[in-house]
Amino acid sequence: MGNIGFLLPLKVFVVVLCNFVTTLSEESPSTTTDQLALLALKAHVTHDPQNLLATNWTSATSVCNWIGVTCGSHHQRVTALNLSHMGLIGTIPPPLGNLSFLSELDIRFNHFHGLLSMELANLSSLKYINFGHNNFRGEIPSWFDSFTQLHSLLLYSNNFSGVIPSSLGSLSNLEKLILYDNDLKGQIPIAIGNLSKLKRLYLDNNQLSGQIPSAVFKCKALEFLSLTNNVLEGSVPQEIGNLTRLRYLYLDNNNLTGQLPSALFKCQELEELDLSQNALEGSVPQEIGNLTKVIWLHLYRNNLTGEIPATIGSLSVLRYLYSENNSLTGQLPLTLFKCQELEDLWLFDNALEGSVPQEIGNLTKLRWLGLNRNNLTGKIPATIGSLPVLDFLYLDCNSLTGRLPTLQPSLRGFSVSNNNLIGEIPSSVCNMSSLRYSLDLSRNNFHGIIPECLGNLSNSIAMVDLSMNSFHGKIPENFHKDCLLRLFGINDNKIEGSLPRSLVNCSKLEILDIGNNNLIDTFPIWLEKLDLQVLILRRNRFYDRIDNFEGKFSFTHLRIIDLSHNDFNGYLPTKFFENLQAIRSESENKDDPKYMKYSGTNRGYYIYESLFITIKGSEMELLKILNAWTIIDLSNNRFKGQIPEVVGELHSLIVLNLSHNSLSGPIPSILGNLSALESLDLSSNKLKGKIPAQLVNLKFLEVLNLSWNNLMGLIPRGKQFDTFTNDSYIGNLGLCGLPLSKECSNEQNLEPKPTKSGEDGDAVNWKYSILMGYGCGLVCGLSMGYIVFTTGKPWWLVRIIERVQQKYVIRGKIRRSGGRK
């Protein structure tokens, strides 16, 4: 025994040595393969902002110690590669396909680009792929079916195009398929229905078309399904009832039609349901009460009709209900106010009627309440003033009566415009220090004085609209030194006194409308440095000259100015027109104009929905004012002298009204350069000379009024001038030629020489042109007849408004609170 005792340590040494040699012989070549594959990837990275790969991925250290690399504990082969959120720019090289033990590949939130190399198909051990938020392009490779062990495929937010390959349907272990935010087209492949383990399917924000295949609803394990923002059509299949585990369903912003399928309400695990922005019709079924776990219910912008079912009261955990922009009728069901978890309730733009129940006071967690643009009647319940966390209350455009209740100080936005409310502004308004967005009491029957405290609130609130009531007294004098007002409207009241000079503190003020009151003051030159875009002083008692401009940058942002029906006098100030840079320059956003709005919240809303303008003697209201509108109305004052030549440099001007003044001299021929002009009214002045032939070049001109001046000579013909009637020229005894019955003498018959741009029509006989003009006028008249009859607006105004608003079609989607789970 003593002779062989020394053999035990020797045996241990031999075993360890053999294992080391075996490991070394097995590991080195394979480890080298992995290292070369990763070094090839490093070489294809053109930008490494944090130098993570540059300083860490070196041959001096084991690949298993490299950042983002995980190796197996036994064989020391690379099993996972995570380079997410590194800001890398580059491409994926073919050698990466040599990582034969790789099971997880995560390179999300980088800037990798190009096509996916086919050699990646060799990564047959992959279970998890995340290429999200990169710039890969091309079709999703059909060879993805090589990854038979794959349970998660995330290719979201890239530039993949083409169709979704049917081969993905063979990935029997797939649980997550996330392809949103790409450029995928075509139909959803039926083979998706083979994915029996699929739990999450996100195909939103692509261009997928056709109907939703019933096969999708064979994936009975689905918990998340999002097909948002595609061009899917047809009805929602009844097979959706198979998805009894479904928790989140987003089908919004498609072209889906038909009724809400009754089978949908078998999905009793639903927590979020979004069917908004489709063309769904019919009523909301009583079975909606089965969705007792739903938190987020979006049905807005469809064609839903009928009453809100009483069973909605069963949705005890409902927090967000958006069903606006439908045609829902009937009264607000009392059971709705059992949903005491409600935070957002939006039912505006429907046809709801009846009163707002006192039970609304039960919704103590309510933050947003939008019942505007319905047919609600009765008084505003006092309980609405006791909602402790209410931020936004919109009840405008109904038929509500009575007085305003005491309001919560927590309110940040409040509108009751377009109702039949009476009384004075309650003192509780002075305590609303949280107001940030809007205080809109316009178009009611309120009276009394405007509280001084509104001036103090101006350091927080963006919009105050008290227009079209019966307020009297003076405008508050105490606008805060840090005034944040963007809109201040008190037009159409009985306000007296002068404009408070503290308004100059409102450096962000864009819209000031004080028209149709009894204000007495001079022109507010002291507002010249503000960002005013709309200035309306019409129908007051403003007086004196407006030519005392000294600054170079006075009113440079003004696009709409209405000084009509005042007592201004003196000469039209050249300097004033020179400063109107917003009208002098061509519109930079002709193809993408915006409505004038203040988007201070995630819901967005218009801050100024109307103004009154005078065209051809008729006072009309324009709704939802476009940024493209440019209007100058100085009519019904006592201006004298000639029209400044600089007016012809206002290239974006659409409406110009200088009528009913004492202007003299000729009509400047440079007005023919106003290429956007659609309405020109110079009537009831003392203008003389001939009508410039250059005005024929105004191809959009719909309204021309030169009546009651001292003009003479032949009336120009051609283009829009062939459509104007006698009314445009009446009261000018020296004018002759069509459309007037007075013929011209030989001397008068010398037609003004046309400009170069008008010569293209000279080959046509002028009498024939006149006949064509009248013919076109007849056709247009017939086509517009229905609009005129139903709206009560003259055809010429309808055409001006429609042209401006149809030029600019705005289509956008407001994304609601909540997010992808």
What are these regions (language model features)?
Residues M1-K821:
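Plant-biased, solvent-exposed loop and capping regions
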